């Protein structure tokens, strides 16, 4: 078929997207990302290659994916609406008592309480109150920390202020360090403080070794070492912390009861949402309409959405995001693991035109694209009464940008081309899908106005840095599988080619860059001026990638996150 050239037409050559090269990714802070790395339109003048030829079909990059977690255990669970309503009334009664505590405490006590509210997953009930208190308290933070020698207290203060975008310097920990930068040896037995310091900063753990005499503290430490608070999903951390807090000797019974009731309230909402998504998936009936080349990830995609926003008021938003992720996974697998190059070109062309029949392609691909188009129409129905149709149009534009990038990767894989690392990253930061995920996360949020979507489209450094970190995580986690299905244009391979290093050296460098970009994400978190709630959504999308890819490809090999998913859906918290 014709290829993409400077004026937007198609040819058999590779797609050229954005600037020809990026500056070196060392250091990453010097990187300047293109705001428009892909041509806005792809235009086909005529098709010259049959997309159904036997030769092409014989060269499909077939790959057998592991099954979904969605089995009878998940399909059999249900939520009683009367129980949800009863829990809601209990929450309102307890919320008033907790709110009184916030008002009556002195500054340090209040910050410790805010830390508990965040850790227990109930801070969202008091967001406005908390933000107002911290705005005033931060003006006196130096006096608050003066003479404070309790490392646990300093760690709590540090975490709370930074979480609410008050940039408290990590220099507050210098008082606990030797001249060489190590923590004082006398602190090494204070496991709780060191755990909190590690969790709040997300730094490499160099100081704590050995076990704990307190079993529940030992379990908490293991959780933090597996995924720090900067990396883990809030909903998972809340579930873990409630269990930890219950075993603390001096826990507050009112807070504990409030947290348990609130979490079960959320869990029952998640169960209802899963039922909605499963019903939609069954009615879609893609399993009988398209070849079985793809991952079915309904419950896993809802878990992703829960990690982006866990609050009950975002139930519709989670359903919108989950459905989008389910279809994206299937289309991503179409490009990566099934379609031929002419088919990939045809699908992308039809996607650009937002039609199923503009360019000839197999019926199963028409069904898939029609499913996506219909889903976007459903979303328009959800936001029409709010006057936010523009939000879905922004989302559609992000789909097109994403699939143009996927086409480029497909071309590289099908032609055996290995670009240099800089060329690869221009495309790779798009195929990571952070931008499209943030866009669809915003669609269901009434508070996300046109300015929020303009912010995404401006390609702010905050999101671009999350893009980069996510791309690096994904490249490390998926390298072996991508090689197995013939995708030789991987980040690792491209880095080895450009810098003439071994595979082992490339992996070490990728891990170093992941650590470095994590610091950059934190820096940009404080520089970004859009509303805090929206910034946190983007930040949480990055956390989703950490949670699912730090220890392997959790979307493909769902056992990696199976324990977390089970704890949220199947293990309902006891009150």
UniProtKB/Swiss-Prot annotation:
The gene is TPS20. GO terms for biological process: diterpenoid biosynthetic process; sesquiterpene biosynthetic process. Mg(2+) 3 binds at residues 474, 478, 482. It comes from the Eukaryota. GO terms for molecular function: cyclase activity; magnesium ion binding; terpene synthase activity. A motif (DDXXD motif) lies at residues 332-336. Predominantly expressed in roots but also in leaves and stems. It holds the Pfam family Terpene_synth_C. This is Inactive terpenoid synthase 20, chloroplastic. The keyword Cytoplasm does not apply.
């Amino acid at each position: 078929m014709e290829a993409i050239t400077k004026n937007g037409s198609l040819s058999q050559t590779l797609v050229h997207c954005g600037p020809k090269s990026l500056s070196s990714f060392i250091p990453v802070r010097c990187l300047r990302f293109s705001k428009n790395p892909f041509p806005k339109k792809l235009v086909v003048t005529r098709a010259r290659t049959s997309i159904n030829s036997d030769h092409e079909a014989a060269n499909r990059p077939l790959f057998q994916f592991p099954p979904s977690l969605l089995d009878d255990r998940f399909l059999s669970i249900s939520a009683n609406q009367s129980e949800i309503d009863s829990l809601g009334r209990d929450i309102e009664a307890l919320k008033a008592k907790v709110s009184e505590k916030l008002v009556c405490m002195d500054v340090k006590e209040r910050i410790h309480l805010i830390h508990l509210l965040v850790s227990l997953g109930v801070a969202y009930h008091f967001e406005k109150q908390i933000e107002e208190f911290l705005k005033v308290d931060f003006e006196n933070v130096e006096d608050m920390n003066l003479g404070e020698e309790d490392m646990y207290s300093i760690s709590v203060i540090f975490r709370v202020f930074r979480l609410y975008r008050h940039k408290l310097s990590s220099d507050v920990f210098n008082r606990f360090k030797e001249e060489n930068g190590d923590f004082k040896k006398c602190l090494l037995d204070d496991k709780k403080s060191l755990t909190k310091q590690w969790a709040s900063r997300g730094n490499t753990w160099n100081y704590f070794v050995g076990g704990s005499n307190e079993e529940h503290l030992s379990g908490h430490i293991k959780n933090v070492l597996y995924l720090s608070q900067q990396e883990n999903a809030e909903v998972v951390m809340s579930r873990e912390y409630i269990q930890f807090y219950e075993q603390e000797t001096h826990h507050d019974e009112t807070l504990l009861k409030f947290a348990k009731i609130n979490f079960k309230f959320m869990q029952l909402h998640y169960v209802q949402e899963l039922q909605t998504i499963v019903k939609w998936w069954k009615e879609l009936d893609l399993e009988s309409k398209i070849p079985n080349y793809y991952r079915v990830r309904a419950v896993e995609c809802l878990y992703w959405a829960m990690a982006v926003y866990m609050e009950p008021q975002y139930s519709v938003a989670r359903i919108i995001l989950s459905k989008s992720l389910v279809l994206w996974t299937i289309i991503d697998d179409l490009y990566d693991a099934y379609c031929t190059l002419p088919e990939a070109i045809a699908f992308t062309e039809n996607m650009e035109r937002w039609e199923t029949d503009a360019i000839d392609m197999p019926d199963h691909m028409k069904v898939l694209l029609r499913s996506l188009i219909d889903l976007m129409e459903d979303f328009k129905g959800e936001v029409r009464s709010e006057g936010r149709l523009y939000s879905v149009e922004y989302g559609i534009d992000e789909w097109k940008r994403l699939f143009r990038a996927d086409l480029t990767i497909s071309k590289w894989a099908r032609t055996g081309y290995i670009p240099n690392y800089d060329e690869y990253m221009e495309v790779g930061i798009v195929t990571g899908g952070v931008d499209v995920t943030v866009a669809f996360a915003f669609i269901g949020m009434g508070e996300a106005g046109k300015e929020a979507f303009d912010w995404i489209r401006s390609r702010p450094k905050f999101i671009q840095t999350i893009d980069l970190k996510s791309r690096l995580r994904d490249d490390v986690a998926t390298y072996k599988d991508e090689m197995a299905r013939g995708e030789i244009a991987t980040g690792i391979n491209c880095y080895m080619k450009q810098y003439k290093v071994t595979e082992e050296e490339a992996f070490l460098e990728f891990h170093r860059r992941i650590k470095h970009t994590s610091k950059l994400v934190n820096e940009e978190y404080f520089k970004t001026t859009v509303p805090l709630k929206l910034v946190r959504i983007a930040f949480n999308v990055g956390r989703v990638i950490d949670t699912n890819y730090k220890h392997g490809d959790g979307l493909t090999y769902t056992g990696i996150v199976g324990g977390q998913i089970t704890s949220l859906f199947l293990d309902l918290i006891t009150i």
